[in-house]
Amino acid sequence: MSSNIHANHLSLDASSSSSSSSSSSSSSSSSSSSVHEPKMDALIIPVTMEVPCDSRGQRMWWAFLASSMVTFFGGLFIILLWRTLKYLWTVCCHCGGKTKEAQKINNGASQADGTLKPVDEKEEVVAAEVGWMTSVKDWAGVMISAQTLTGRVLVVLVFALSIGALVIYFIDSSNPIESCQNFYKDFTLQIDMAFNVFFLLYFGLRFIAANDKLWFWLEVNSVVDFFTVPPVFVSVYLNRSWLGLRFLRALRLIQFSEILQFLNILKTSNSIKLVNLLSIFISTWLTAAGFIHLVENSGDPWENFQNNQALTYWECVYLLMVTMSTVGYGDVYAKTTLGRLFMVFFILGGLAMFASYVPEIIELIGNRKKYGGSYSAVSGRKHIVVCGHITLESVSNFLKDFLHKDRDDVNVEIVFLHNISPNLELEALFKRHFTQVEFYQGSVLNPHDLARVKIESADACLILANKYCADPDAEDASNIMRVISIKNYHPKIRIITQMLQYHNKAHLLNIPSWNWKEGDDAICLAELKLGFIAQSCLAQGLSTMLANLFSMRSFIKIEEDTWQKYYLEGVSNEMYTEYLSSAFVGLSFPTVCELCFVKLKLLMIAIEYKSANRESRILINPGNHLKIQEGTLGFFIASDAKEVKRAFFYCKACHDDITDPKRIKKCGCKRLEDEQPSTLSPKKKQRNGGMRNSPSSSPKLMRHDPLLIPGNDQIDNMDSNVKKYDSTGMFHWCAPKEIEKVILTRSEAAMTVLSGHVVVCIFGDVSSALIGLRNLVMPLRASNFHYHELKHIVFVGSIEYLKREWETLHNFPKVSILPGTPLSRADLRAVNINLCDMCVILSANQNNIDDTSLQDKECILASLNIKSMQFDDSIGVLQANSQGFTPPGMDRSSPDNSPVHGMLRQPSITTGVNIPIITELVNDTNVQFLDQDDDDDPDTELYLTQPFACGTAFAVSVLDSLMSATYFNDNILTLIRTLVTGGATPELEALIAEENALRGGYSTPQTLANRDRCRVAQLALLDGPFADLGDGGCYGDLFCKALKTYNMLCFGIYRLRDAHLSTPSQCTKRYVITNPPYEFELVPTDLIFCLMQFDHNAGQSRASLSHSSHSSQSSSKKSSSVHSIPSTANRQNRPKSRESRDKQKYVQEERL
């Protein structure tokens, strides 16, 4: 075949034109510039003896083109003719039908039944024919439809064969435009013939299935078939090949996107759009190049095909690209008139397409997810998935705590999943931690993205919340949906999620696979934030101490003898867990606690106790009745995890005579090697098997105190109308009250002398988001306080807002409301803010302002307003007229062994600076505005500022550390919640989820037993049994004495800020010192944080070992009752004394 072709690069069109002249005209040359131009006596059409081809070189391109044109226009004519005849037939039948119908109506009565049968038979035949045609049409539609497997296979096959036909065209484009070919010997022609037979059959199916034949005939795919299929059959008939319009097969590339969608390869809108643009651009490019290749190699017909030029197909592709891009180098250009005319129009359309399509294609390619792909798990290394609110602030805070150097076992890779790509700052943060952090773009609501991050093999999934969002309920709903999606994909995954609102935690209980016993946790920021603030009402500064305990802080050493030195030494302490050595088995908790503190330099505050049925409970300072079991888990306060190992390695035989705790390391005793707990990591808790700890702090084996037995005098003396508890026995409870009964007017509040109470100043209106005041009230109404020890709570704020909160507060006793504003000094004076134990400033309008620096403006203004107020000497007036103000423990009838015996009365407060205040802040940097006399830099971290160190400011951001702490040890969260919520349990949460309110219960032995749990207290050293240690004594001696004598566990000091100065100072501010060392020197003005046991005898006498919440200048306690009531030596005479009061005060007292 190749031998019959005279020259591969010769232009056939120019040569055929030359062959019509005489053979002797060899001197005349073609207009072609080809250097391989043949002599004019050569035959242009290759001739072989086997193929009957026209030896005269006659061109037959018109035959190929005519076959296509006849097919197209002939079919178009038939379709139009059919439609015309059908229309005329329909019109005629319509008119004839009316005539026949009229005749049928007129002659219907005279016609016999038999005359109608031929008509019925004809209608049945027509119906049968219509049914057959419809069936064939439906069958053809199914065959070409991509909705069935057969249709999809057929569609894909047609596309693949079209690409194959295009490839054959590329191969044949290197041959002359028209040449003689033997069908039986040309392999490419045979393949092309087979392809086109298949295309013809597929065309028939499409034609049958088409509803509108005319539009089908004019479709792009149909036009492609018209100009590519008939010429192949003409080639076989004429033994001649014409390259012609076969380049139109490139238009099939437009369907490439549809084919990929049929194969389920393209799923996203961006990928579909990208493939669409690319396929349209490439198909147009290749088709136009094919046309230029045809006309340039053929020449113009009116020029007798003499102005042709030899261009390969790929040179034409190059020409079209430089033309579309408007570059036009000029090395290749069109010479024929047809080619130039085509280029004129193509430049207009091609330039528009190039200018619009190419930038969009580049943008789609450039915007492809940089953080796509999938996570590849590393053998021997766990990974966690972090999702939710992913920002620079939230991620940096999380990583700073999670990857803290004090954690010695962080072999965990952190995988962040978020649907928005990180900004440059966040991307830089990820790069700085690239060895332990990876980021993937996606959504946890998409199962495909969950599979990408290997959620099924993840150790846990942590969901962060946006604490500063405008709609907390919507944010909680988003996180709940994330939990549902993750649990639906993998029910066994452990999830730790942040929640903003307490009432939204109930929705998590509706998720079937949510199981807190298996490690699932919901960290409710509102619950913990208000719980911390409530504990500061009982012991000022406690919120700061607890916040520092579960936050990882590095030790900052200060040489100067300043208050920051002692504060930062305590800040470096954190909460850890470790299994106790078998050397402690059988010893009581106080004995082990003293041994750990004195010898191991560790402070143990709680243990995990397993009852006979293997149920685990966390017991905080359980007392001397409980003995340590084998494999007991202890909760320690220490500076790092390595120190806590001493409790596990301690051996009495090997370490009894060691004085340096750093030398206590693992010894070679066989007893330690065989110890079962040694196989457990201190960070792996009950998730390795067994039941997770219940947050209850009361053990099942309760001490058998006769005061807890029903029928005892204690129960008989209980006033059933006052001393009631909820159904769990964890909180004081009363019958629901209408809000009108607890509302005080300003005059009523002023006439009712309040003292030792808690004033809650709240900013909120009818449209503000609820902050959940129940979480503030519940710790103040814990049942481990006796009723007379409960501090009265007075809310000052908008009545519209408080009405929305009242449904959750109406079951708590001693709650009053003063409608007004915390910025009104008259309202503040009416509630005797100078006599309160604590003033709490909250805001429900924090997140509705775009400027973060203005989010706390109301709280800051209220705080400064109170501090600038001046008061008279109200204390002296009260003491002169009423003995009822005597605080608990100050009564001279108190037993001599009371640790608070002989304390001084509260000094008079004449300035608002001395009022104990705790202010909630949203923006940490706003803490600089609370104290005007401090020197805090605006860039100083919150925990280093004076207001936070003094316990007068609290921000929700400090709770971010709980995510990391809970992951490494979920018992830490249980311990924190037990301390700050007053005893909230999952059972209580389930009950609140059902009724949204506490349910009253009878005082049964089981519920009364729940009262026997320790509580946080604050003791003064100025007087009492510890007074001898207050002046220069050691903290370690105080620790041991309190533990042995009263089972009280000391864990910190609340010291005056200027106590270290040699000269007296008028400053009344105090700061927190956490877990001071044994030899730490005490001063008389110190207040000691301690965990105090429940006093069963305090309910019958005002003299009790009770807590106190001191003001910044106070070293004594206040009563938490209405102090206009005269008291007697016996508490039981109080109702009688009330009857002797005037009627107005009695009514006001009943309202309270």
UniProtKB/Swiss-Prot annotation:
Keywords: Calcium, Cell membrane, Ion channel, Ion transport, Lipoprotein, Magnesium, Membrane, Metal-binding, Palmitate, Phosphoprotein, Potassium, Potassium channel, Potassium transport, Transmembrane, Transmembrane helix, Transport, Voltage-gated channel. Mg(2+) binds at residues 413, 436, 438. Residues 530-550 are annotated as: Segment S7. GO terms for molecular function: calcium-activated potassium channel activity; large conductance calcium-activated potassium channel activity; metal ion binding; voltage-gated potassium channel activity. Residues 948-968 are annotated as: Segment S10. Residues 381-523, 755-899 form the RCK N-terminal domain. A lipid is attached at residues 92-93, 95 (S-palmitoyl cysteine). Belongs to the potassium channel family. Calcium-activated (TC 1.A.1.3) subfamily. KCa1.1/KCNMA1 sub-subfamily. Potassium channel activated by both membrane depolarization or increase in cytosolic Ca(2+) that mediates export of K(+). It is also activated by the concentration of cytosolic Mg(2+). Its activation dampens the excitatory events that elevate the cytosolic Ca(2+) concentration and/or depolarize the cell membrane. It therefore contributes to repolarization of the membrane potential. The S0 segment is essential for the modulation by the accessory beta subunits KCNMB1, KCNMB2, KCNMB3 and KCNMB4. The S4 segment, which is characterized by a series of positively charged amino acids at every third position, is part of the voltage-sensor. This is Calcium-activated potassium channel subunit alpha-1. It comes from Sus scrofa.
